[in-house]
Amino acid sequence: MHKQPLHVATLGGVRFHHAGAFWFGVVLVTAGVIAHIPMYLMGKDIGYRLAGMPMDTPMLIGMGAIVVGFIASLYGLYPPSSATKSRIASHVRVRALDDAPLSWAHVGLLLTMAVAVTIDVMKPTALAFVMPGMTLEYGLKSPLNPTGTVPAAWLALSGIVGTVMGSFLWGWLGDKIGRRASILYAGIGFIGTSICGAMPSFEWNLAMCLLMGIAVGGMLPICYALLAETIPARHRGWLMILIGADIAGAYILTSWLATELVPTYSWRILWLIGLPTGVLFVMLNRWIPESARFLLAQGRDDEARKVMARYGAVVVEEKESELEIESDVKNQWSELASRQFLGVSLVVGCLALGSGLVLFGFNLWIPTNLRKLGFTESDAILRNAALMGFPLTFVVAWMYGFWSSKKTIILLSSLTAIALFGFVIVGDAVVQNRALLYALLIVPIWGISSVVAVLSVYSSEIYPTRIRSRGTGFAAGASKAGGVAMIALVVFGIAAPSIATVALIGAIPMTLSVFLVFFFGIETRKRRLEEITADEFARAA
C-alpha cells in the first residue's frame, strides 16, 4: 500500500509538503495587503483619488511580503516529486463514487462551490463598475472622456489576457498538485491582487488586473474538474450546469455593492473587497475535499478512502484496476493532441473559440451598433433579451443531464449559428423590425452563455483524470482567446465592425463546431468518466 512521507501534513485530502510554509505564506500575503490600506485611507478627504501619489514605505514592504507569501504558500502546497510521478493503478473500485447516493456531503460541496463561483466571477464583473471612476481619475480615453489619450480598454485587455494565461497555468497546476490545492492557491491570488484598489498609478493597476485575471481564469476550470470527479454520474451533468448558472448571482451582488459603496468609498473599494472575500474563499476550501479520483490516480489510496467514505461510497478493492485504461496517459499538454483525444480537442477548441468570438465580439459590439443605427433603447433591449432567455437555462440543464449531452451541444451551436447568420442576411435593416430583432438577439445573448456553461461541463467529462484540469483549462483559455482579439480592436482604436461583420465572425466557427461535434463528439450523459475514456481509446484503436 502507498505510504505518505512522514514530513507531509494532510487536511481533508490536501497534501501539504510543508503546512507551516503554506500558512506562513497566507499570513504574509494578507499582512502585505493590509499594509496598503493606510495609502488608501490617506485619500479620504479628496474622494480617495490617489493618482500621482508616490508609494509609501509600508506599501513597498507589503508588496515584498505578498511576493514572498505567494512563493511560500506554493511551496507548502507543492507535493514531493515522488507523489506526482506515481504510475500505480489503484485497485480501489472507482465505480463506488458513481454508485453512491446523492448525500448531504454532495449538497454541501455544491453549495460551497456555488459560493466560490460567485466570489470568483465577482472579480471580472466588478470591472464594468470600476471603469467609469478609473476613467475619470486617470483621464483615460472612453465615451465618458473622449479627449483622453490612453484607452480605458487597456484595463479590460490586461484582465482578459490574464484569464487566458491563468486558464493554461492552472490547468497544469491542477493536474500537478491537485484540484483543491489549486483552488486554494487561486484564493490566495484573490487576496494578494486586491491591492489594486490602493495602486496610485494606472500602470500598476494594469499589472494587478493582469495578475487578478490569472487567478480568476484558473479557478473556474479546476472547479468543474473537481465537480466532475466527485458528483455521481447520473446527476453530474445537470447539477454542474446549474452551478454555472450561478454567475447571475455574482452580477446581482456586485451591482448591489457598487451601488452601496462606490459613491462613498470610490471605485477602489470594489478591488479592496478582494481581501475579505479572498480570505472567505480560503476558509470555504476546508469544505471542499480533494478529488478521490485524482488521489487514486496519484497512488494516494489512504487519502482517497477517507474522501470516498465522506461521500458515502463503499470502499471495495478489485483484482483488476478500473484506472488501468489511463495508465498510459502522460501528465502533459501534448496528450490533448494524441490520437485518442485529438478529435474531442478539436471539438473543444473550435467551440470555445467560436463562443468567445460571439461573447466578446457580437455581444460586445451590439450595443454600439444599435446606437449607431439610432436605436436609443439598446440597453433595455439587451436586458429584456437576457431576461427572456434566462428560464431556458433550466431547460438546457435538463436536456444535457437527461436527454443527450452531444445533441444538446449540437442544438445550441446550431441555433446560435442560425441566429447569427440571420443578422448577416438582414444586416442593419434588423432595427426596422423589433420582433425580429428580439427573436434573433435572444439566442446569442442568452444562448452563448449556455454554450459556455455546457462546454465547461463537457470538457471536464471527456478527458481522463491525469489531464482533466488541462482539458478544462484549454477550453477556458480558448474561449477567452477570441475576446483578446476583439478587445484589442477597441484598444487600438479600430472602428466598430458592422452587425453583419461581427455576426459572420462568430457564425463561421459555431457552424464548424456543429460538424465537429457530430463526427468527433462523444456522448457523456450519465456515463462514468472511466467509461468515457475507455470509449475514446476504443474509437482510436
Question: For the regions a protein language model found, what residue spans apply to each?
Answer:
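Intracellular cytosolic loops and amphipathic helices of Major Facilitator Superfamily
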Residues: 1-9, 41-45, 62-99, 287-341, ...
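Helix-to-loop junctions at the C-terminal end of transmembrane segments
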Residues: 167-178, 392-405
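Structural signature of the two symmetry-related core transmembrane helices
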Residues: 181-195, 408-422
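Residue-level signature of mid-helix packing/kink "hotspots" within the transmembrane helices
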Residues: 125, 159-168, 251-252, 389-394, ...
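Extracellular/periplasmic helix-loop-helix junction of adjacent transmembrane segments
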Residues: 48-56, 130-164
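Glycine-rich segments within core transmembrane alpha-helices of 12-TM secondary carriers
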Residues: 235-265, 272-281, 476-486
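Helix-loop junctions at membrane interfaces in 12-TM secondary transporters
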Residues: 198-208, 263-266, 425-439
